[in-house]
């Protein structure tokens, strides 16, 4: 296979000084002097840019002609025949895509060790300054969300994309090293795992046609009825809210499995913490109890944070500084590392995000029951926005108070009341709590949640009925308890919540390439 063109990351990591190179990328900025033009070039492979220097006196005779354009497949008029140097450089604007050839030499300027002294410059794609939305000036996060198809070309979102890619790889490495099998669970399902009722329905029914036919039938005096039996699947189908139930089926055959895929919630909530489409990591372990679940979750989080600090140190350092500057000016985008349970957030200091991640990665989590957590909150003397009582679901303010002001580190709360947890969680002997757990971290609150699953057939069936579900819809799930049942446990990690934590970005819409939220499904 023909070798691909080198990335800037490869060139800058192992610089072949004095060697002739050909680079490709997008223009971040251009600066002109009497003797040279300086182009800041990025290809997104790393946080750094490469300075391309075009010496004006020497280059005019050697700039690209139409002959070079013919070497680039599917690029029409990449270089205009007979174009002068001035004309070519005029088309080199912020956002333009270019190819530059020349010698890599030590840079006499500050800020970079190397530069490319160009002898050949080709404009592959123009970005006219009068219409290209992302100019050299800084843009708000809100503005960039409206241009999500272009925002990866900014330094902040390119860094976030690289962190996302690195952490996705770390997820797979963690489980592969521990002999988990990766299982693909369905996106279209007939089962509701969480019971919240916030589901997207999947149908081939055409509402316009249905309305037209219903009107015609009504005008003729005939009732018009349509059921899911007439739909594509012959029954109600939905987008999945979790791959857990199907994951359990494979855990009870392969022992250790995990899923990693998109999930969907039709929750009509426009906040910095909610998405309608997001990714979940969900391991499931046969022959495991709730304590095993806690151990793996704690180890998993530390592994991911260490991987981010090791593999994305430069991006995290950049985000630590840059995201705070943007987020402070936008409501709802306060950097996570600067958040506090106090009414006035503390001043953000350089390196705060990195220090927080390092502290959480090495600190063992304090473990306490839900009942113990409620007592601590009730006796704290703190006036919370959401009042605390036994039986309430812990809110972010409660979780951050425990992690930041009581224990000063990660916390695992377990044994929650059964009324606020899902039907599949195993009942404790007291009959009022279930073997569930949440892993909480400073600056965010809950980052993972899991439980030991109910493995007894009769108890599970009773829990399904008590939760208001039709047992017939879960017949396949209860079969797992009828045939070769085994104790098992698992947990879920919202991948975007992890990314929020690692990048320090205050709005979850900024850690996924194309956010899906109520009334927003662009791109």
Swiss-Prot record:
Annotated Gene Ontology cellular component terms: cytoplasm
Key word Glycoprotein present: no
InterPro entries: Aa-tRNA-synt_II (IPR004364), aa-tRNA-synth_II (IPR006195), aa-tRNA-synth_II/BPL/LPL (IPR045864), Asn-tRNA-ligase (IPR004522), Asp/Asn-tRNA-synth_IIb (IPR002312), NA-bd_OB-fold (IPR012340), NA-bd_OB_tRNA (IPR004365)
Molecular function terms from GO: asparagine-tRNA ligase activity; ATP binding; nucleic acid binding
Coiled coil: none
Location of this chain's protein in the cell: Cytoplasm
Keyword Aminoacyl-tRNA synthetase: yes
EC number: 6.1.1.22
SUPFAM superfamilies: Class II aaRS and biotin synthetases, Nucleic acid-binding proteins
Residue span of region Disordered: 329-350
Predominant location: cytoplasm
HAMAP family named among the record's database cross-references: Asn_tRNA_synth
Subunit record text: Homodimer.
Family: Belongs to the class-II aminoacyl-tRNA synthetase family.
Name of this chain's protein: Asparagine--tRNA ligase
Provenance organism: Treponema pallidum (strain Nichols)
Lineage start: Bacteria, Pseudomonadati, Spirochaetota, Spirochaetia, Spirochaetales
Gene name tied to this protein: asnS
């Amino acid at each position: 296979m023909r070798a691909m063109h080198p990335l800037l990351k490869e060139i800058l990591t192992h610089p072949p000084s004095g060697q002739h190179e050909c680079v490709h990328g997008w223009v971040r900025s251009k600066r002109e002097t009497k003797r040279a033009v300086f182009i800041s070039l990025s290809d997104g492979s790393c946080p750094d840019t490469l300075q391309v220097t075009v010496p004006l006196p020497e280059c005019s005779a050697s700039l690209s002609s139409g002959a070079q354009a013919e070497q680039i497949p599917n690029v029409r008029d990449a270089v205009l025949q007979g174009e002068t140097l001035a004309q070519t450089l005029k088309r080199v604007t912020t956002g333009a895509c270019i190819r530059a050839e020349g010698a890599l030499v030590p840079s006499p300027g500050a800020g970079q060790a190397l530069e490319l002294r160009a002898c050949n410059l080709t404009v592959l794609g123009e970005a006219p300054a009068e219409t290209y939305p992302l100019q050299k000036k800084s843009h708000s996060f809100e503005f960039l969300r409206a241009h999500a198809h272009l925002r990866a070309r900014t330094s902040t979102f390119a860094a976030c994309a690289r962190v996302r890619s690195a952490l996705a790889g770390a997820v797979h490495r963690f489980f592969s090293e521990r002999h988990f099998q990766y299982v693909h669970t369905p996106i279209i399902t007939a089962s509701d795992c969480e019971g919240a009722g916030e589901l997207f329905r999947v149908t081939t029914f055409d509402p316009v046609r249905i309305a037209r036919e219903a009107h015609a039938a009504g005008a003729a005096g005939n009732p018009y009825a349509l059921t899911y039996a007439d739909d594509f699947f012959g029954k109600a189908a939905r987008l999945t809210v979790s791959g857990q139930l199907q994951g359990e089926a494979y855990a009870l055959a392969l022992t250790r499995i995990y899923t990693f895929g998109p999930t969907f919630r039709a929750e009509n909530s426009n906040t910095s913490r909610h998405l309608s489409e997001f990714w979940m990591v969900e391991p499931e372990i046969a022959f495991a109890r709730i304590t095993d679940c806690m151990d793996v979750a704690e180890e998993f989080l530390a592994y991911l944070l260490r991987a981010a600090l090791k593999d994305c140190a430069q991006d995290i350092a950049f985000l630590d500084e840059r995201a705070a500057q943007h987020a402070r000016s936008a409501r709802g985008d306060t950097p996570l590392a600067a958040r506090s349970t106090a009414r006035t957030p503390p001043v953000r200091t350089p390196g705060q995000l990195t220090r927080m991640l390092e502290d959480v990665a090495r600190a063992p989590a304090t473990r306490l029951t839900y009942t113990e957590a409620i007592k601590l909150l009730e006796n704290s003397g703190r006036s919370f926005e959401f009042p605390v009582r036994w039986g309430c679901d812990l809110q972010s303010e409660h979780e951050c108070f425990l992690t930041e002001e009581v224990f000063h580190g990660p916390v695992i709360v377990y044994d929650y009341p059964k009324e606020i947890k899902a039907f599949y969680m195993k009942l404790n002997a007291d009959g009022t709590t279930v073997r569930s757990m949440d892993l909480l971290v400073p600056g965010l609150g809950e980052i993972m949640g899991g439980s030991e699953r109910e493995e007894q057939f009769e108890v599970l069936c009773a829990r399904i009925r008590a939760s208001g579900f039709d047992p017939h819809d879960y017949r396949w799930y209860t079969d797992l308890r009828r045939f070769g049942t085994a104790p098992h446990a698992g947990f879920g990690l919202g991948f975007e919540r992890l990314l929020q934590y690692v990048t320090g970005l205050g709005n979850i819409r900024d850690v996924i390439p194309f956010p899906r939220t109520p009334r927003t499904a662009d791109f």
